[in-house]
Amino acid sequence: MQDERPVDQLTEAEAAAELAHLAEAIAAADTAYHTHDAPRISDADYDALKRRNRAIEERFPALRRSDSPSERVGGALAEGFAKVRHEVRMLSLENAFELAEVEEWIERIRRFLGHVGDLRFTAEPKIDGLSLSLRYEKGRLVQAATRGDGETGENVTENARTIGDLPTELTGAPDLLEVRGEVYMRHADFAALNERQEATGQRLFANPRNAAAGSLRQLDPAVTASRPLHFFAYAWGAHSEPLADTQQGAIARLSALGFATNPLTRLCTGPDELLAHYADIERQRASLGYDIDGVVYKVDDLALQRRLGFRASTPRWAIAHKFAAELAWTQLEGIDIQVGRTGALSPVARLKPVTVGGVVVANATLHNEDYIAGRDSKGQEIRGGKDIRVGDWVQVYRAGDVIPKVAEVDLSRRPEGAEPYRFPDTCPDCGSAAIREPGDSVRRCTGGLICPAQQVERLKHFVSRAAFDIEGLGARQVEALWRDGWIRQPADIFELPNRYRDGLQRLENREGWGRKSAENLLAAIEARRRIALHRLIFALGIRHVGETTATLLATHYGSWAAFEAAMTRAEVGTGSEWQDLLSIDGVGAVLATSLVTTFHQEAERAAIDALAAHLTVEDAEMRAPVESPIAGKIVVFTGTLEKMSRNEAKARAEALGAKVSGSVSARTDLVVAGPGAGSKAKQAAALGVETIGEDAWLRLIGDA
């Protein structure tokens, strides 16, 4: 994030473009982590994206998107499980990586509450597993659900019943009680499971979290029962009567009901005690026998928790103090160039293998040519301007199951004669020119569909889980079928059963294929001839169109016929179809140009039409609008509010769908003015913006 411009220097157009990019990046990270159990970026990088998004939204409230990451929790649901709507949302936590961020969080709480006395907090290890909500009625477990997107999860009740330390009956519990916690796998059990997987020729799990998530989300409960899962309880959802008056008391009550709770939970006062317990837990981390990735702090007084309430996706009364990324030094042995589906040339460091956080690392991303040269995409120095050369000793870090990164270079150990790296200006796969367009941070191959690397990567994207998700057709199978000339574009996949009347026999004779796997693949292809509109749009692999944008486009146009017709008629920069495209919240000129250009390129359009001929595309589900008198409006508070704090008023407005701004402009819909209102009230009057008092505000939102 070192190439960011300060938020106060952004123009409105720049802010809108960056919010669109951030929405895509965060949505992709959410899906990778929550839906596919395969995180792609570190927690620190993820949190930096979220902070940047929040800062831009606060500076430009009118640009807040309908798909804002600030209002989203988790990822999309996997297919195969019944959906469960959470009576009380399962939210994520705000993250902190430095003590200063924890101190700032405490200060925000004090300001929100107007509280000057001592505040007490609980501090507990943050378990690196899968969140689970357990619903008990009359003491009996009746439902277990994953977090999903926070609003709706997956019904895994039968699987949860197989977890040994998870009680299925409670004595002395409220008539209704939802207990929430984390499913995890111990290190020793994880090692034994992977040994069994290897012995039976099955896929190995990358880490205990992935193993726990994959084991709980099995369609066959017998498989889950064979896996050694455990559960720590740490929270609750819906309940018919309170568990206690404090967080600590509620955890003690859960323990008395028979739930495993973490023995390292402590009651602390102030940041010094919190940090001391954080350090104590970090010292014990390696010997705990299960993975943790930080310490969670919560306001202990439940009455204060209720007053503090929630932001769109996180509670104000809790924060996760994450552990720093793990680091190691090793030597850079070479730099390889990989070509992605949009032609991006990505440099990858080939490293002398080194262990980082218990995982052997032999490759790491180098991002782009600027990063190698020691500068960001705007020409500003990073790493003190030190470039990266083959032979250098570099510092590598990773946090979670993500692509490792090179953080630093030790110039004192640079070999004599090490030459500056010259980034290629031609594609290593097809030889086409590789150009870097103004404003782009990467160099791209211009070969398009003639580039073998782009063909393969587009096909991999097409069959990925968020796209067509064809069972039995993963990256390795795509590479093999492409190499043998069976498939070149997505339509070829659907022509396999018809084009090769003896296709089943030919598949069966291939290495790694048997009769059953061949039958299953052809059946899976047939099953995917019917596809949801948003999945198809995402699967096309159009540059700048991620999962979130694909869903927005699908919702806007409703059907494939309407979408295809609009893209056909649209002209870049002009016409009603172009303006209609730009009117979609989250679609800017760059993204719109990419869409329209793709549909107007002859080869690209031919490939799209050939694919569509094989498909039945389901129309999009239309979302119901938020029902509130202030939904979608920009509200400004000024002066002194007497019946609630300014922060509480802001939180209430945002919960009802409004956007709260700190300044009055022509876009402002409503100003709420209390005693002492000054320049903002005058500015509102000059602009003709409606201004009301606090009592009228409370009546408007139904809180009078």
UniProtKB/Swiss-Prot annotation:
GO cellular component: cytosol
Boundaries of every BRCT domain copy: 625-704
Pfam families: BRCT (PF00533), DNA_ligase_aden (PF01653), DNA_ligase_OB (PF03120), DNA_ligase_ZBD (PF03119), HHH_2 (PF12826)
EC identifiers of the protein: 6.5.1.2
Stored Gene3D superfamilies: 5' to 3' exonuclease, C-terminal subdomain (1.10.150.20), 6.20.10.30, BRCT domain (3.40.50.10190), DNA ligase/mRNA capping enzyme (3.30.470.30), Helix hairpin bin (1.10.287.610), Nucleic acid-binding proteins (2.40.50.140)
Binding positions for NAD(+) per the UniProt entry: D43, A44, D45, Y46, D47, S92, L93, E124, R147, E182, K298, K322
Enzyme type, top EC level: ligase
Molecular function terms from GO: DNA ligase (NAD+) activity; metal ion binding
Binding-site positions, Zn(2+): C427, C430, C445, C451
Matching InterPro entries: BRCT_dom, BRCT_dom_sf, DisA/LigA_HHH, DNA_ligase, DNA_ligase_AS, DNA_ligase_CS, DNAligase_adenylation, DNAligase_N
Cofactor(s) this protein cannot do without: Mg(2+); Mn(2+)
Keyword Protein transport set for record: no
Keywords: DNA damage, DNA repair, DNA replication, Ligase, Magnesium, Manganese, Metal-binding, NAD, Zinc
Entry keyword NAD: yes
Gene Ontology terms describing biological process: DNA repair; DNA replication
Catalytic activity: NAD(+) + (deoxyribonucleotide)n-3'-hydroxyl + 5'-phospho-(deoxyribonucleotide)m = (deoxyribonucleotide)n+m + AMP + beta-nicotinamide D-nucleotide
Annotated catalytic residues: K126
Role this protein plays: DNA ligase that catalyzes the formation of phosphodiester linkages between 5'-phosphoryl and 3'-hydroxyl groups in double-stranded DNA using NAD as a coenzyme and as the energy source for the reaction. It is essential for DNA replication and repair of damaged DNA.
Family in the record: Belongs to the NAD-dependent DNA ligase family. LigA subfamily.
NCBIfam families in alphabetical order: dnlj, PRK07956.1
Protein name: DNA ligase
Gene: ligA
